Amino acid sequence: MRTTRVMGVGALIVGTGSALPVTPAQQAGVKRTDLQRHDLGVPGREVVQVRVELAPGVAFGKHTHPGEEIIYMLEGSLEYEVEGKPPVTLKAGDVLFIPARTIHAARNVGRTPGAELATYVVEKGKPLLTLVQ
């Protein structure tokens, strides 16, 4: 009986995860963990929270999001290149706002893993992340 319940909950979690818009495959040294996704009171908009971890020396290339991104650094230090601005290095406790559809990239400039809590306020139903050449 207990096994059935656990399997049922597991199927629900897997089913819920598969409904999320597809993001690029995990890159070596980069781990993205979807934490939550909720509709907003504004039609066609949703908020998404993701924990993003980068191993030391790893970079995540240029990309955009279909809405605003607010970054809160949890640990380590990451350098961000945001289109039209000088590079900025964030450490634990720092925050960064990235406007909608702004090209940006990140890399871990430290000797320890870097982790951020990324909060996105985006257009519902669009891919959360689009890589840029």
What would you call each of these model-derived segments?
Residues 66-84, 94:
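Glycine- and acidic-residue-biased ligand/ion/polar-headgroup-sensing regions
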Residues 60-65, 82, 89, 107-109, ...:
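Short histidine-centered beta-strand/loop micro-motifs
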Residues 54, 84-101:
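Short acidic-glycine-tyrosine-enriched beta hairpin
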Residues 79, 87, 101-126:
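Ligand-binding loop in jelly-roll beta-barrel domains
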Residues 49-51, 70, 95-97, 118-119:
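Conserved hydrophobic/aromatic beta-strand scaffold that supports enzyme active sites
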Residues 45-47, 57-72:
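A short beta-loop-beta micro-motif enriched in histidine and acidic residues
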Residues 2-51, 97, 127-133:
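A short, N-terminal "cap"/entry segment at the start of jelly-roll beta-barrel domains
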